[in-house]
């Protein structure tokens, strides 16, 4: 069944008019915000912390009234996305504030979008939000949550109790399959100063020099484990993010901890409830810092090495190259100008891989498979059938032996052909270093 999501709203929420990803519509029949989805949209994964992932995306522009720049009115725009079973649907909310409230952190005084200031953390609260799962889901219990930790829910839970500003909310759908919430709030929304063009950079703590990549080292405990906090400390003690303004560097907060967890997740490494994980020998963390002033950001890739954890090695075999061979990458493109000369040996993975219809061996260096491949024809050869009886030659003028290969015989040749002094082309035959060649013209 095709999932459909639409939003019904009048003056719904100081959020933006952006084209929806999924089928959606905006109307003015109700002052509330309603998200509709088909019955198959409910996530039934019992391991999930919540069934429905609700993620508002909000951006704000700060008002500018400086004399030397054009006047800019502040504004707040955005979308609400709901994710079910790995699919995301985005709905638009109207760009006004009739049923939304903007407040500065620590204040209950409402702020108009036109008056938003740069560098201030705001909370946007969207009132009267409903999720419609259809009458076929009437009476079911679902849990609402968000991957964004700044998103909170207020409403009546499935036990008929009011919960305020909670990260997840378990609700019972009504007779129409609708979950009704008092509000959804998004904290730490910053208005961007569009007249500020200063960039964010990462710096070395010791030298003060700008850096574009980094490296740190941490040791594992006697069980081969490292705590995320130790990696955070190692990175933050060596590098910091800052933005130059008013003749000084203003530090910017980096997402170091989240970046570490994301890097480990990419390697399918679990982090336990107290932050410990089974450490690999190395992994790369992409630390990002974003300015709350103008929205500029920078990313610093940091290689984390755990020296007392052995680097894993892959099984490899040694293969003799029977024909001069170039290296190729995973897309079958030449890697530099280096080549392996014939009769030398190279370490490769035991099994071949196919790239663009051709068979290759992946190269192993220092116990690790690298992005370098050698055409298998230069190692294993290619089986070809003779269409004529053929002699075996050592050179253009001299036979290698008295052997006569018979028509119809299958012979293994290695690599591309060679052109001899007589202008004719020959294939190398024989898995050895002997000078044994057969004319290309003798093969089918």
From Swiss-Prot:
What GO molecular functions are on record for this protein?
structural constituent of cell wall
Q: Which UniProt keywords apply?
A: Cell wall, Glycoprotein, S-layer, Secreted, Signal
**Predominant cellular place of this UniProt entry's protein:** secreted
InterPro entries in the cross-refs: S-layer_prot, SlpA_C_lactobacillus, SlpA_D2, SlpA_N
* Record GO cellular component, one term: peptidoglycan-based cell wall
Q: In this entry, which stretches build a coiled coil?
A: none
Q: What does the UniProt function comment say about this protein?
A: The S-layer is a paracrystalline mono-layered assembly of proteins which coat the surface of bacteria.
* Protein name in UniProt: S-layer protein
């Amino acid at each position: 069944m095709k999932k459909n999501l639409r939003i019904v709203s009048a003056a719904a929420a100081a959020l933006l008019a952006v084209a929806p990803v999924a089928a959606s519509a905006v109307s003015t029949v109700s002052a509330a915000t309603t998200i509709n989805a088909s019955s198959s949209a409910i996530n039934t994964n019992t391991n999930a912390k919540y069934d429905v992932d609700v993620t508002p995306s909000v951006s704000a522009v700060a008002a500018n009234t400086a004399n030397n720049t054009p006047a800019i009115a502040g504004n707040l725009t955005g979308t609400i996305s709901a994710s079910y079973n790995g699919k995301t649907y985005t709905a638009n909310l109207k760009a006004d504030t009739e049923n939304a409230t903007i407040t500065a952190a620590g204040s209950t005084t409402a702020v108009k979008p036109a008056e938003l200031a740069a560098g201030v953390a705001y909370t946007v609260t969207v009132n009267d939000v409903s999720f419609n799962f259809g009458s076929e889901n009437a009476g079911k219990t679902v849990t609402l949550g968000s991957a964004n930790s700044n998103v909170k829910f207020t409403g009546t839970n499935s036990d008929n109790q009011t919960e305020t500003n909670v990260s997840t909310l378990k609700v019972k759908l009504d007779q129409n399959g609708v979950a009704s919430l008092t509000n959804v709030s998004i904290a730490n929304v910053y208005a961007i100063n569009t007249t500020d063009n200063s960039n964010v950079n990462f710096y070395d703590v010791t030298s003060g020099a700008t850096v574009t990549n980094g490296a740190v080292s941490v040791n594992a405990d006697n069980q081969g484990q490292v705590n995320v906090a130790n990696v955070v400390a190692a990175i933050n003690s060596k590098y910091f993010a800052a933005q130059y303004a008013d003749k000084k560097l203003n530090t910017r907060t980096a997402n170091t901890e989240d970046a570490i967890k994301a890097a480990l997740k990419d390697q399918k490494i679990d982090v336990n409830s107290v932050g410990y994980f089974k450490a690999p020998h190395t992994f790369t963390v992409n630390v990002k810092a974003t300015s709350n002033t103008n929205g500029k950001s920078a990313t610093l890739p940091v290689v984390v090495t755990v020296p007392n954890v052995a680097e894993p090695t892959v099984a490899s075999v040694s293969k003799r190259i029977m024909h001069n061979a170039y290296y190729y990458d995973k897309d079958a493109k030449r890697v530099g100008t280096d080549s392996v000369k014939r009769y030398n040996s190279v370490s490769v993975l035991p099994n071949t891989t196919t790239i663009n219809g051709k068979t290759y061996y992946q190269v192993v260096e220092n116990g690790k498979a690298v992005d370098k491949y050698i055409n298998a024809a230069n190692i294993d050869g290619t089986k070809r059938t003779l269409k004529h009886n053929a002699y075996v030659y050592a050179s253009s003028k001299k036979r290698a032996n008295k052997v006569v290969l018979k028509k119809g015989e299958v012979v293994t040749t290695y690599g591309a052909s060679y052109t001899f002094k007589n202008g004719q082309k020959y294939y190398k035959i024989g898995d050895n270093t002997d000078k044994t060649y057969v004319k290309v013209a003798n093969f089918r």
